[in-house]
Amino acid sequence: VLPVATSLLVKDVKLDTREESKIDENNKEIKQWKRIEVLKDYRFYIMCMTMLAMPWIATGSFVYQSFISSSKEWGPYVIAQSFMAYSILSVITLFISGFLIDKFSSRKLLIYMNIPLLFGTIVLYYFDASLSSFVFFGLVGVTNGLANVLGSSTWAEIYGVKYIGSIKALTTALMVFSTAFGTALFGFLIDIGFTIEDIAFVSGTYIFG
């Protein structure tokens, strides 16, 4: 997902925000996309693949935290304590990502959104110490902070704001589906004998591939 998104999203996309004045100077019209038009745009599906990684991986990890704890032989309160790292880093990233979006634009940040989550799956795959729980959920929190801001601003930048309500409704529905998918997928993989390391590998492969 990351390499494909990198090559496609930072190219010649006309923005409806900071670049509007430049476009107006050249007498170019900014297109306001309707939802049906968005559904016909291949870039939309590539961006969705990037944005939906966080919901299904994080939800699966939250729901099956007892399985993760037993597999890693962590104490009963380790993951609960790790949520502090998740929450703190999520909030910090929310503020930082807002500044970065204003400076660089959402489309340029989107390609980096899942990198912390990718490193988190690597940590979960290779390390068993209790500290790795804090690192994993902390990295998930960083991606969560980025995703919460980019999940709104990206669509407005690329597809305009006139029909942003219907577009955002569509992407929110897909996000909800993604969380349900993550829970089902984690459960299925556990039932057929996958270890948490195997699941981390599958998750990391999805992000990178």
Predicted regions and their residues:
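Helix-loop junctions at membrane interfaces in 12-TM secondary transporters
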Residues: 126-136
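Intracellular juxtamembrane helix-capping segments at the cytosolic ends
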Residues: 146-159
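Helix-to-loop junctions at the C-terminal end of transmembrane segments
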Residues: 93-105, 190-191
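Extracytoplasmic gate region of multi-pass secondary transporters
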Residues: 36-97
